[in-house]
């Protein structure tokens, strides 16, 4: 389980940015010792390869809640195909159990080095967000950067919470916009 293998250096990197690591966020959010990591069915019998997202379920004040949280310290929290599939699996499980799902977003969008597979995974996630709409409460917490294609997923949830001076949501960054427009406004 990834929670038990947390690297202290990764945590200190987040603290330097005035942010918590996803493991710390889980420990603060859930009732003590109630969180259980969840792996998609096809991962249970294989060596699980960590892909920058932790999924699971537990209780918050005794209420069952499902969860996914991005790890910015792993590849900038970017969405790879497996990363997206893991989030989709936890949302579908939350729908089966008729429980709310909380997602903590902290990443740089699609994992470009994976090419079209990463973007396809994001598209499948957006579709799953729409399937869950009106079925279960979907709550998004923007706990850092939420960039590029990844910004659409929280936009499809029921509630979005941001953190003053830490949260950023954008499709295209200021540097790219200024370059394309030939301006220096942003």
Q: What kind of region is each of these model predictions?
A:
Residues 19, 99, 159:
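Short glycine/serine/threonine/alanine-rich loop segments
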Residues 57-71, 86-113:
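A structural preference for short, pocket-lining loop segments at secondary-structure junctions
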Residues 4, 16-19, 31-35, 96, ...:
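Generic secondary-structure signature for well-ordered alpha-helical cores
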Residues 105-186:
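Conserved catalytic cores of soluble enzyme domains
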Residues 75-82, 114-119:
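Flexible beta-alpha connector loops of hexameric P-loop NTPases
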Residues 1-65, 69-76:
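Intrinsically disordered, low-complexity segments enriched in small/flexible residues
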Residues 51-53, 86-89, 146:
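Short alpha-helical segments and helix-capping/turn motifs at coil-helix boundaries
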Residues 51-55, 64, 99-100, 126, ...:
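Short glycine-rich loop/turn motifs
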